Swiss-Prot record:
SMART domains from the UniProt entry: DHDPS
Source organism: Oleidesulfovibrio alaskensis (strain ATCC BAA-1058 / DSM 17464 / G20)
Protein name in UniProt: 4-hydroxy-tetrahydrodipicolinate synthase
One GO MF term: 4-hydroxy-tetrahydrodipicolinate synthase activity
Annotated GO biological process: diaminopimelate biosynthetic process; lysine biosynthetic process via diaminopimelate
Catalysed conversion reaction: L-aspartate 4-semialdehyde + pyruvate = (2S,4S)-4-hydroxy-2,3,4,5-tetrahydrodipicolinate + H2O + H(+)
């Protein structure tokens, strides 16, 4: 399975404390209509940390059902417990996901050997395509390029990585060490074009929740050799990307989607609504982009 182009790390719409299935299905449908290249439910942006196990399964199940094979679904299945990650991966496989996204274990800060053994054990237990997810700013641990290459060499089920270290040297080394068949996706909306320029294949994006056509257009333009168009889209996306991270993700992106009329704004504690000045700033950016 090829995971490339722009994949949306899709939000989980909530209403009265429950998953808003109607809004979620409508959002998925709009994403596909706008030309997105894949969907990633139950990631950080989908508030996976505060979903119950039952809700986690429902979010993935609904996404797969609504997509109906039109674009790849890469289901979030990570945990800081290897055993729990195996269970989440098994569910994703049984539900019909095209692959699973596995974040590096967080909080318990495993060594590089521990990271290697974690991914190896999951793949041995549940055989399916995996994309690893390196985001040291959230997990407290960085997976080095050497460890990524070791996993790629020994664990064929691991077909790529979502790289959100914001370290272009490390990303370049991963591409160098792992070769062109290893799918390296940006996990940072600000570094999509630089990552593509050194051999990456796309992005798992937050900002594409609100502008799927623009982010998929950037990736398509680059792949087609239209570097001028890709650069133009990169700069058009930059103000929106900054706005998506003016507070903790996914607070701004869910607020933006609410302003656009695509969902009711509801977050789960400890996430709280935006500060008034930041909300005003966000609305201004969306207005300039013609989104509200």
């Amino acid at each position: 399975m090829q995971f490339s182009g722009a994949l949306t790390a899709i939000v989980t719409p909530l209403k009265n404390g429950h998953i808003d299935e109607e809004a979620y299905r409508n959002l998925i449908e709009w994403q596909i209509e706008q030309g997105i290249n894949g969907l990633v439910p139950c990631g950080t942006t989908g508030e996976s940390a505060t979903l119950s196990h039952e809700e986690h399964r429902d979010v993935i199940r609904i996404c797969i059902d609504q997509v109906k094979g039109r674009v790849p679904v890469l289901a979030g299945a990570g945990s800081n417990s290897t055993k729990e990650a195996c269970g989440l991966a098994q569910f994703a496989k049984d539900a019909g996901a095209d692959g699973a996204l596995l974040i590096t274990p967080y909080y318990n800060k495993p060594t590089q050997e521990g990271l290697y053994q974690h991914f190896k054990a999951i793949a041995a237990e549940v055989s399916m395509p995996y994309i690893m997810y390196n985001v040291p700013g959230r997990t407290g641990v960085n997976m080095t390029s050497e460890t990524v290459a070791r996993v790629k060499r020994d664990v064929p089920e691991v077909v790529g990585i979502k790289e959100a270290s914001a370290n272009l040297k490390q990303v370049s080394e991963i591409i160098e060490f792992c070769g062109p068949d290893f799918q390296v996706l940006s996990g940072d909306d600000f570094t999509v074009l630089p990552l593509l320029s050194v051999g990456g294949c796309g992005v798992i994006s937050v900002v594409s929740n609100i502008v799927p056509a623009k982010m998929s257009g950037l990736c398509k333009a680059f792949a087609g050799g239209d570097l001028a168009r890709a650069k133009t889209l990169h700069h058009e996306l930059s103000p929106l990307s900054r706005a998506m991270f003016c507070e903790t993700n996914p607070i701004p992106v869910k607020t933006a989607l609410s302003m656009m009329g695509r969902l009711s704004l509801e977050l789960r504690l400890p996430l709280v609504p935006m500060q008034p000045q930041n909300e005003k700033y966000l609305r201004g950016i969306l207005s300039l982009a013609g989104l509200v």
